[in-house]
């Protein structure tokens, strides 16, 4: 085993890396958000998934205001080290639209189909 260092990840020109959140047990993809090296470190230290909000230019602890927290179970690095997978225990909906997942729209035969309503 090797000690993990967030600085070894491959960030984009803005110092960000995409992170996909996946529900523990089911494997359901919940959402994608951005992290920087500090939010990766905070996530690992606290066990609460912490993203970087590009619009607010601030840390975003998932569920801090909504109560829809993501408890980190496992953090995985892809083969190119330029994308993360956070396996989480999600409390409540993951999406800010109050849906279980952010990927609730399907494109089928050129048409958009909404797969789920808000909870």
From Swiss-Prot:
It catalyses: 1-(5-phospho-beta-D-ribosyl)-5'-AMP + H2O = 1-(5-phospho-beta-D-ribosyl)-5-[(5-phospho-beta-D-ribosylamino)methylideneamino]imidazole-4-carboxamide. The keyword ATP-binding does not apply. It is found in: Cytoplasm. GO terms for molecular function: magnesium ion binding; phosphoribosyl-AMP cyclohydrolase activity; zinc ion binding. GO terms for cellular component: cytoplasm. Keywords: Amino-acid biosynthesis, Cytoplasm, Histidine biosynthesis, Hydrolase, Magnesium, Metal-binding, Zinc. This is Phosphoribosyl-AMP cyclohydrolase.
